[in-house]
Design a protein with these regions (language model features):
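Conserved NTP-donor binding/palm subdomain of two-metal-ion nucleotidyltransferases/polymerases, i.e.
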Residues: 1-121, 127-306, 315, 321-413
Length: 413
């Protein structure tokens, strides 16, 4: 696919996603449905397009459209089955009086206009340290079989459904960030008395993270994947949907402090810029105080006064790169500067290149061992170091820690 065709395809994909999620008007006629569907599937967002009232394609592509439409019922059925498993686990953990929270995936799907259209992955559940071993027994009693473990989680499977029991929220690389995140979870999850935060799935209240910690998790999750093997649009849409849904309930002081301690404030700004510019979310859902940069007053003032409907992401990047992918951009009273816009655009380009996370270089990484991981590390550091410098500086330490963990695990098996 040529660069021009790719640009056109992603302009159309973003327009259709904004229509499916936010009700914006979308194009009536789709010139190249095959290319659009291919990219939507690479990004794991094709299911969201089922929400569109109508798609009009040329005569030659109608068989492909009908074939794709035939996938709607299987997708909804798969998500219903996934929800049933989530509720089954929640009931079992509640009966055992365990402290746990549902992470990412199905908890994000619950805030979509049509939750059954989001393509599901694994079921991720965080367990407080004092309940981790008991939770493993609960899973095994339900017929789940242990598959493997990492520094982050232990993985169980049953009839094609994968459950990851997390002993940590997210594998941060920078040692101080690891420490701060562990302290946050201990204070705000592990030792809390009566739990107050739930999402309703199939009529059952399933515990989830407090809103500010949920935002921290999703920000860190995207950052980790984006700075390693890559990130797809599904996770980026999740982030925007969660901020749009829970933005008014965020404890902004706690969020600001957590992002600062984990060195994620800049990446939060990048995701905010991405969400507004490309996904069409309204800026008022985000904590604008986190986006203000004291060393960029003039840039902030300039962008904050530009509310022209014709403004787009391309206006915030150098003129030599004016072919930027178009934005929705009808709500640009938004204090980010050209550096944030450039990084948001680089995140978009990276997502387009790699597709849904781990597609880029995944086989090379699995088969190449330390050399492969080192090559990917230096490649990403060269391109994306300024997204989150501390994480890149911490990766060698984390790789060594993971290698020692694997050696220790092998000695005991």
């Amino acid at each position: 696919m040529s660069k021009a065709d790719q640009t056109s395809t992603y302009d159309l994909l973003f327009s259709l996603l904004r229509s499916a999620l936010l009700g914006e008007t979308c194009p009536v006629e789709i010139d190249n449905f095959a290319a659009l569907l291919h990219e939507a599937q690479r990004q794991a967002v094709d299911g969201l397009l089922y929400a569109l009232p109508q798609l009009s394609v040329c005569e030659e592509e109608r068989p492909l459209l009908k074939q794709w439409i035939g996938g709607l019922l299987p997708l909804e059925m798969a998500n219903r089955q996934m929800n049933q498993v989530v509720v089954e686990l929640a009931r079992a953990f509640d009966a055992a009086h365990l402290r746990y929270v549902l992470l990412k995936g199905q908890s994000c799907a619950a805030v979509y206009p049509r939750p059954l259209l989001r393509r599901a992955g694994d079921i991720d559940i965080y367990l407080a340290p004092q309940h981790f071993e008991e939770a493993k027994c609960v899973l095994q009693n339900l017929g789940f079989v242990f598959d493997h473990q990492t520094l982050l989680h232990e993985v169980f499977e049953r009839k094609g459904v994968t459950v990851e029991l997390h002993r940590a929220l997210q594998p941060m690389q920078w040692p101080p960030a690891v420490k701060h995140l562990k302290q946050m979870m201990h204070k705000e999850v592990d030792t809390v008395g009566e739990w107050q935060h739930f999402v309703e799935i199939d009529g059952y209240n399933v515990p989830i993270l407090p809103p500010h910690l949920n935002v921290v998790l999703l920000t860190a999750h995207i950052m980790v994947h984006a700075t390693h093997l890559g990130i797809g649009l599904r996770q980026l849409v999740d982030w925007g949907m969660v901020l749009t849904t829970y933005g008014h309930r965020l404890d902004r002081a706690l969020l600001k402090n957590a992002l600062s301690q984990l060195h994620l404030t800049r990446f939060y700004r990048i995701l905010s810029a991405f969400s507004v510019e490309y996904l069409g979310f309204s800026a008022h859902h985000f904590d604008l105080s986190l986006l203000e940069k004291t060393n960029s007053t003039s840039a902030i003032a300039a962008s904050a006064t530009d509310s022209s409907p014709s403004s787009s992401a391309s206006s915030l990047v150098p003129s030599s790169d004016s072919s930027a992918y178009s934005s929705s951009s009808s709500n640009l009273k938004y204090p980010y500067d050209s550096f944030d816009a450039l990084r948001a655009k680089s995140l978009l380009k990276w997502s387009i290149k790699v597709g849904n996370h781990a597609m880029f270089g995944s086989s090379f990484s699995r088969n190449g061992g330390f050399l492969a991981h080192s090559c990917i590390y230096f490649y990403n550091m060269l391109l994306h170091f300024w997204w989150v410098p501390t994480e890149f500086l911490g990766i060698p330490w984390y790789m060594l820690r993971r290698a020692l963990y694997r050696l220790s695990f092998m000695k005991h098996t």
